[in-house]
Swiss-Prot record:
Keyword Iron-sulfur: no
Motif interval(s): Nuclear localization signal: 152-157, 191-197
Phenotype upon changing K263A: Increase in the stabilization of the structure and partial delocalization to the nucleoplasm. Complete delocalization to the nucleoplasm
Species: Homo sapiens
Modified residues (Phosphoserine): S4, S10, S43, S70, S125, S137, S139, S227, S242, S243, S254, S260
Region feature Required for nucleolar localization, mapped onto this chain: 243-294
Location in or out of the cell: Nucleus, Nucleolus; Nucleus, Nucleoplasm; Cytoplasm, Cytoskeleton, Microtubule organizing center, Centrosome
Keywords: Acetylation, ADP-ribosylation, Chaperone, Chromosomal rearrangement, Cytoplasm, Cytoskeleton, Disulfide bond, Host-virus interaction, Isopeptide bond, Nucleus, Phosphoprotein, Proto-oncogene, RNA-binding, Ubl conjugation
Protein name: Nucleophosmin
Sequence positions bearing N6-succinyllysine: K267
Disease annotated for this entry: A chromosomal aberration involving NPM1 is found in a form of non-Hodgkin lymphoma. Translocation t(2;5)(p23;q35) with ALK. The resulting chimeric NPM1-ALK protein homodimerize and the kinase becomes constitutively activated. A chromosomal aberration involving NPM1 is found in a form of acute promyelocytic leukemia. Translocation t(5;17)(q32;q11) with RARA.
Length: 294
């Protein structure tokens, strides 16, 4: 439906041309155009008496078609050389065919204005633009190493945004783990320093009292290492698929930024699966119905 609307609303290129005519008692002016596809309009600006006009009443009349398609006559200006030799109409627009005549007076009367034409863009120029686009796409494919990626740029952008969010969450988790490990390492260093400060005499005294050699305590250090190894071995829970509402919000944000969503159902389903890791068929159908309602 969107493609058909684009075809109907083809771009128009407005063109303006000067218009002018002379009216006399026995000389009317007929303004008509050929049956072409362009829209024409006559915009009248000024009506003025000529240099040789007599000091008498001149009435200028226009005849055209009304809304119902019936002919209608209207008075444009009433002129007299000693009272009002010229009248400004300020852009009196009439759709052709139009007949301009001098209803009263001998003239001459001069009418000036603009002939407006709304010309559609040439089909040849559109074909040339399409050929240029095709040439650019072909050259881009040839220059891309390794055949290039077939994933559209907008899909890659959405996936990149999600990866950035995941990376931010992982960085936060790693920062928390580093803080915990620093605290444990600080606790481990305190007993180690105490054991270093103990003199050999005390160690010998303890060994004589117990009847066996004393061994330096390595429990805090070993616990810290074991906890750090556990943290390294513990796999992080993979992030599950986004909810339907979150996906709708992200799609809406992408549309507001100037992006677009696939119009074909199969492409849309692949887009949802690849970008949002969604595998629930009911949720995908819900998203497709929402996409069609846009």
């Amino acid at each position: 439906m969107e493609d058909s609307m684009d075809m109907d609303m083809s771009p128009l290129r407005p063109q303006n041309y000067l218009f002018g005519c002379e009216l006399k008692a026995d000389k009317d002016y007929h303004f008509k155009v050929d049956n072409d596809e362009n829209e024409h309009q006559l915009s009248l600006r000024t009506v003025s008496l000529g240099a040789g006009a007599k000091d008498e009443l001149h009435i200028v009349e226009a005849e055209a078609m009304n809304y119902e398609g019936s002919p209608i006559k209207v008075t444009l200006a009433t002129l007299k050389m000693s009272v009002q030799p010229t009248v400004s109409l300020g852009g009196f627009e009439i759709t052709p065919p139009v007949v301009l005549r001098l209803k009263c007076g001998s003239g001459p009367v001069h009418i000036s204005g603009q002939h407006l034409v709304a010309v559609e863009e040439d089909a040849e120029s559109e074909d040339e633009e399409e050929e240029d686009v095709k040439l650019l796409s072909i050259s881009g494919k040839r220059s891309a190493p390794g055949g290039g990626s077939k994933v559209p740029q907008k899909k890659v952008k959405l996936a990149a945004d999600e990866d950035d969010d995941d990376d931010d969450e992982e960085d936060d988790d790693e920062d928390d783990d580093d803080d915990d490990f620093d605290d444990e390492e600080a606790e481990e260093k305190a007993p180690v320093k105490k054991s270093i400060r103990d003199t050999p005499a005390k160690n010998a005294q303890k060994s004589n009292q117990n009847g066996k050699d004393s061994k330096p305590s390595s429990t805090p250090r070993s616990k810290g290492q074991e906890s750090f190894k556990k943290q390294e071995k513990t796999p992080k829970t993979p992030k599950g698929p986004s909810s339907v509402e979150d996906i709708k919000a992200k799609m809406q944000a992408s549309i507001e930024k100037g992006g677009s969503l696939p119009k074909v159902e199969a492409k849309f389903i692949n887009y949802v699966k690849n970008c949002f890791r969604m595998t629930d068929q009911e949720a995908i159908q819900d998203l497709w119905q929402w996409r069609k309602s846009l």
